[in-house]
């Protein structure tokens, strides 16, 4: 199954050099904390529409492969994050199979729970970088995060109804 927003997410082109962004845009794109929590601070009820979830091979990765360890299998989760039922963000998480051991096995059992609710309660979470991307008028970002030093890649596309615009 796919979703048009996830097609746009996969089409993001990332800036080699961080662009100069006006404060409202940079406040959203460079946020270090949970996007779920930020949406809830807007007074919205946040829900997840799960689009894809399961293992994929390395050949299914795009330029993501260069940002993750070389492994035969990766856990993929693609979602739409809704605020009061309106789609605000498309998200794609890719985690190498080796990341999914110990407490990080919970990444496979999130179901309708936003990823941020899990990630940002972990004291072992670190972020290596945030890359800013764009597809036509839509902005997005990609981060390599680590849980207990184990990597995962999170890509987010801000949809037209989100407060970023």
UniProtKB/Swiss-Prot annotation:
Keywords: Cytoplasm, Lyase, Pyruvate, Ubiquinone biosynthesis. Substrate binds at residues 35, 77, 115, 156. It holds the Pfam family Chor_lyase. Pathway: Cofactor biosynthesis; ubiquinone biosynthesis. It catalyses: chorismate = 4-hydroxybenzoate + pyruvate. GO terms for cellular component: cytosol. It is an enzyme of class 4 (lyase). Its main location: cytoplasm. InterPro entries: Chorismate--pyruvate_lyase, Chorismate_lyase_/UTRA_dom_sf. Its EC number is 4.1.3.40. It is found in: Cytoplasm. GO terms for biological process: pyruvate biosynthetic process; ubiquinone biosynthetic process. GO terms for molecular function: chorismate lyase activity. Removes the pyruvyl group from chorismate, with concomitant aromatization of the ring, to provide 4-hydroxybenzoate (4HB) for the ubiquinone pathway. Belongs to the UbiC family. Monomer. This is Chorismate pyruvate-lyase. It comes from Klebsiella pneumoniae subsp. pneumoniae (strain ATCC 700721 / MGH 78578). The lineage of its organism: Bacteria, Pseudomonadati, Pseudomonadota, Gammaproteobacteria, Enterobacterales.
């Amino acid at each position: 199954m796919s979703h048009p927003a996830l097609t746009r997410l996969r089409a993001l082109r990332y800036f080699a050099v961080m662009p100069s962004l006006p404060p409202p845009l940079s406040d959203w794109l460079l946020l270090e904390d949970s996007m779920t929590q930020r949406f809830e601070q807007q007074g919205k009820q946040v829900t997840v529409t799960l689009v894809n979830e399961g293992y994929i091979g390395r050949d299914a990765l795009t330029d993501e492969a260069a940002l993750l360890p070389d492994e035969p299998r990766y856990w993929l989760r693609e979602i739409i994050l809704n605020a009061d039922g309106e789609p605000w963000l498309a998200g794609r998480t890719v985690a190498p199979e080796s990341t999914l051991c110990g407490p990080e096995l919970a990444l496979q059992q999130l179901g309708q729970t936003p990823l941020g609710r899990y990630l940002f309660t972990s004291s072992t979470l670190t972020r290596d970088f945030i890359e800013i991307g764009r597809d036509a008028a839509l902005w997005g970002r990609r981060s390599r995060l680590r849980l207990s030093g184990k990597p995962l890649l999170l890509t987010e596309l801000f949809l037209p109804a989100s407060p970023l615009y």
